Amino acid sequence: MSEHNPYGTMHATTIITVRKGGKVVMAGDGQVSLGQTVMKGNARKVRRLSKGDVIAGFAGATADAFTLLERLEAKLEQYPDQLMRAAVELAKDWRTNKYLRNLEAMMLVADKSVTLAITGNGDVLEPEHGTIAIGSGGNYAFAAARALMDSDKSAEEIARRALQIAGDICVYTNHNVVMETLDAD
């Protein structure tokens, strides 16, 4: 247990993005845990931004993630159709702003052209193998998706199976999958 939170650490989620076959899919599970207790099983941690042209998913503290989603939405309004630029500007603010620096979350964002992971360290990472995952079960989902990328499975099937595998292994990930899909370049 932390000195700030008598209930322990909040653990939340697995988010994965798969880009394959002219589609980009982002999927996340619905579990939010506080310490050893499942607080909610149907949280929605994947959503559309920027008039539906961008999909975003978050892992970490929920209030912090919503703050970052609002900031990203503002950056997308400032830099329309420039997800990379908006993400870099958000990462710069996140790293240098005294208030934002303390936010504990990670984000995956994608549009028709690019998929990015954004961290509080100022990192904006673009995956090289068509998939990336974050959160407590992120490594399990990522490994599963990488193993399936050469199969004949669709992006949707890969994302769903990867989350299923992560949910089987990670106690902070469940099988309640929310998925958003965009047509990709």
UniProtKB/Swiss-Prot annotation:
* Record text on activity regulation: Allosterically activated by HslU binding.
Please give the Pfam families that the UniProt record associates with this protein: Proteasome (PF00227)
- Provide the reaction this enzyme catalyses: ATP-dependent cleavage of peptide bonds with broad specificity
| Segment forming the signal sequence | none
Q: Recorded E.C. number(s)?
A: 3.4.25.2
Task: Please tell me which top-level EC class this enzyme sits in.
Answer: hydrolase
Hydrolase in keyword set: yes
Q: Does the keyword Metal-binding apply?
A: yes
Enumerate the subcellular locations listed in this protein's record, separating them with semicolons. Cytoplasm
What are the recorded Gene Ontology BP terms? proteolysis involved in protein catabolic process
- Cellular component annotations (GO), alphabetically ordered: HslUV protease complex; proteasome core complex
Q: Which GO terms describe its molecular function?
A: metal ion binding; threonine-type endopeptidase activity
- The UniProt annotation places Na(+) binding at G167, C170, T173
Entry-linked HAMAP family: HslV (MF_00248)
Oligomeric state and interaction partners are given as:
A double ring-shaped homohexamer of HslV is capped on each side by a ring-shaped HslU homohexamer. The assembly of the HslU/HslV complex is dependent on binding of ATP.
Entry similarity comment: Belongs to the peptidase T1B family. HslV subfamily.
PANTHER family associated with the record: ATP-DEPENDENT PROTEASE SUBUNIT HSLV, METALLOPROTEASE TLDD
Explain the purpose of this protein: Protease subunit of a proteasome-like degradation complex believed to be a general protein degrading machinery.
Stated name of the protein? ATP-dependent protease subunit HslV
Identify the species of origin: Sinorhizobium fredii (strain NBRC 101917 / NGR234)
Q: Which gene encodes it?
A: hslV
